[in-house]
Amino acid sequence: MCISPTHPTALKVQLGRNLRQRHGCYINAANATRIHADDKIYSTTMNVQNTSATQPISYPIEAHPDVGEIIEIAPGVQWLSMPIPGSLAFINVYLLRDHNGWWIVDTGVSNDQTTQLWQRIFTERFTDEPVVGLICTHMHPDHTGQARMITEHFQCPLYMTRGEYYQARAFANNAGESHSGWIGQRFYHRAGMPADFLEEIGKMWSKRSNEGMSMPTLPGGYERLVEDQVLTIGGNDWRVVIGSGHSPEHACLYCADLKLLIAGDQILPIITSNV
């Protein structure tokens, strides 16, 4: 694995700017980019010179992997589904093959079911080829819940942006009081929430905590990801594209050769991602 910062390029202007500033338009110089969002893989085609020449979203890979199942979506890129509580039911996780092992992108929540699935995958997949790096696209517990367990098991580094890492650390430190106590009630009341709904909010956060959806404790150190940084993994260059809105400093990974963007929650094809 090789990491190198680069100067702004036309690719960054095309991909990064349009990713953040144009709703529904994701442009690639090759004019046909597959975008891997957190629920589906989809493709969109757009003429860079004529922005009216758009096509509806299509899904080149229709079959979603079952929970705990791994499928290959591109050379050296594998797609894994992990369970999460609630109606969304699953989170996408990615495995990137390197010369000396594997990288994991995002982790699933911190509960027994997900831990057991990872332990099975460790035995089946990573006995001879260990995990050499973990990337968390952003701070939310369905993406970071197993980060500490994975990094400690393989003694591998965690890669995140600074804004996501330290926000997660701050939330984890006061997770017990921020929503369920009087501070949380006062916050929601000032935001306009009816008094009779405050009790339901407290119950909801208590339930989420029991399901592993509270903010986990991250490893004590991390490797910082920055805009336009390039991670070379298994011969593929993955450029870091930073977004915001859904979370403070969300990291997407774009590989021009594979025409593949791992978008985390910055782009969602079904529900609305706050951007």
What are these regions (language model features)?
Residues 3, 8, 24, 29-32, ...:
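Short hydrophobic alpha-helical segments enriched in small aliphatic residues
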Residues 45-61:
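N-terminal presequences and immediately downstream first alpha-helices
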